[in-house]
Every structure is written in structure tokens, then in C-alpha cells.
From Swiss-Prot:
Record note on quaternary structure: Part of the 50S ribosomal subunit. Contacts protein L29, and trigger factor when it is bound to the ribosome.
MF term (GO), any: rRNA binding
Transcription listed as a keyword: no
Designated name of the protein: Large ribosomal subunit protein uL23
GO term, biological process aspect, one: translation
Pfam families: Ribosomal_L23
Top-level taxon of origin: Bacteria
Amino acid sequence: MSVTTIKDPRDVVLAPVVSEKSYGLIDEGKYTFLVDPRSNKTEIKLAVEKIFSVKVDSINTINRAGKRKRTKFGWGQRKSTKRAIVTLKEGTIDIFGGPLA
């Protein structure tokens, strides 16, 4: 018997990714988000549909290992992240909402 817990969508989708590559994908109807590393594609799809009121066509996920960095005291490591590239069926997401200055 599996027990499912209902996650808050804001705990699944953490933030949009702001980069040149993600800006280029927006023209194709693809949006990139940082997501919780423990979440799966189904949870990500439900969260995006609930938060932004859009229909999701597909989800591609990427697990990125944290970079190894030299510190004063030896070697450290940056945090590992998971990204989701969300393709919409139709419509757009206003990621950077608010008026432009």
C-alpha cells in the first residue's frame, strides 16, 4: 500500500532559472525552473499547472551536481540542484511579473 502526501506546489517549484539559454527557450514555449530534488515529473507538472494556470505538454528534468570549489580550508562543494524544463501546450507564463521600470 502506498501512502501519498500532498505537497504544496510552492515546495516543488522553487524559482525560475534566469540565464541566456532559458530566455532563448521561452520563445519555443519552454520554461526552466529550479525544483525540489526529491520531486518527480508528475509532481512538477501538477505544481506548474496549479501555480500558473496553464496546461503542460511535457517535462524534462536535469540533475546538476554541485561544483567542487577550493576554499581557504580545503575543498568544498556547491549545492547540487535539479532543474525542470517545462513545455506548455498553449499560453505563456509571466515569470517576471510586475510593471517594467
